[in-house]
Amino acid sequence: MAVFTPPSGNSNSTDHTHTQDDHDKDDNDIKKFYIRPSLGLKLWGPLVPAPDNLPGLYTLITIQSAVGFFALWRLRRLYKLPPPRRIATGTHSDLSFGELPSEMIVNGKTKIKKDIADFPTLNRFSTTHGDIVLAPPPIIPRQSRFVSVRKLLWGLFGSLLLSQSLLELTRLNFLKYDPWCDEMKSVRDKKFFNNIVKYYHEGIDPTKIKVKDAMNGTPLSTNIPEVKQSVALARAQVEAQNPIIKWFGPLEYKPMSFNEYLNRMEFHLDMFEFFQNKRNIRENSIELINSISHNPQSSSTGLEGLSESKKLHLQNVEKRLHFLASSGDSISAPVKKRSSTTLSRGVILPHDTKGPQDIDLDTIRSLYDPWMTLALETSLSIKFIPTTMPSHTKTPTSTDQPLPGPTPKALTNEKTH
């Protein structure tokens, strides 16, 4: 006889606390938003669209390129040389911005009209007028440090934006395989089917959704499995067409790291190179065999530049080809007597058919298509519901009643003849 001692209340409260903390942690992980991966749009931060959202990517690339060109245009304006000084031409002279009215250039020398009385070291009461000759102005005008810093910032900013836009365009247009794009497409499909299962088990609220027959308009019961499946599919499609979901993809999606991206790209390139080399070897082998079989006299002259092992191999291939050709001409195929003009598959041949060469394969296949025969003789009814369940779905206990409709693992095949 055994005595069962229930656990103390403290342990229950501790377990409940841990369970609640784990649940809150899972909710926080689900609500966490990850920045979508990109090579040249990282400056946009969380506004970067999903890797398979091509309209969104091209929109951001266009805006980023326009801002980069604007920055270079501002740099060009800062690098513009200042306008020339006022040049005296006869009685007319042009006045440029930032100059004194009395400043002009005559015969390559800068002169400033000044009154001697304006200088305090000279006679203040003198009314004599004269020209003060200054040194010629520098070819490259001196600029302040602030202008130099502005040039540097505008140049770096514009070059950075344009280089990033070019990098992203290269990824979108020149890469035949993009791991980020393929991953996002698979995540969207999984999310779509998970939503179907989720909405199917949630059921239909009669106060919010009413289902009517498309033929006569009579209301249908919301407990019918087919109706629940149709409503779940419609709700999943509406959520997939949400503008936020179309722009970012599923919000809980966590993209792969850049290292994993590079590893997948490297694996794809290695496999592509492997299959390409295999295809080239096969084509070269077929071409070599055809050349040997058609020109046996010239094949011996082409063996001079090859190694000994390759020479022996090609000679063996040539001998086998000649043996097969000679044996095929000397030995005739045995003639079999056909007792009936009806094949085992129900194909009726014409009465004048004496050999395989008298059969019109195109006509026979059009009349006795095996796939069409299989389709007419077979009727399949397959119902498939994904087994993926949402994480927050309540696990049924032994006392809970099973929900109506098919189970998540239901897969029925019905075959009738």
UniProtKB/Swiss-Prot annotation:
A GO-annotated cellular component: mitochondrial inner membrane
InterPro entries according to UniProt: i-AAA_Mgr1 (IPR013911)
Keywords in alphabetical order: Membrane, Mitochondrion, Mitochondrion inner membrane, Transmembrane, Transmembrane helix
Biased composition (Basic and acidic residues): 15-28
Its job: Component of the mitochondrial inner membrane i-AAA protease supercomplex required for mitochondrial inner membrane protein turnover. Together with MGR3, functions in an adapter complex that targets substrates to the i-AAA protease for degradation. Required for growth of cells lacking the mitochondrial genome.
Quaternary structure note: Component of the mitochondrial inner membrane i-AAA protease supercomplex composed of MGR1, MGR3 and YME1. With MGR3, forms a subcomplex that binds to YME1 and to substrates to facilitate proteolysis. Interacts directly with YME1.
Protein family according to the UniProt entry: Belongs to the MGR1 family.
Further remark: Present with 3410 molecules/cell in log phase SD medium.
Protein name (Swiss-Prot/TrEMBL): Mitochondrial inner membrane i-AAA protease supercomplex subunit MGR1
Organism: Saccharomyces cerevisiae (strain ATCC 204508 / S288c) (Baker's yeast)
High-level lineage: Eukaryota, Fungi, Dikarya, Ascomycota, Saccharomycotina
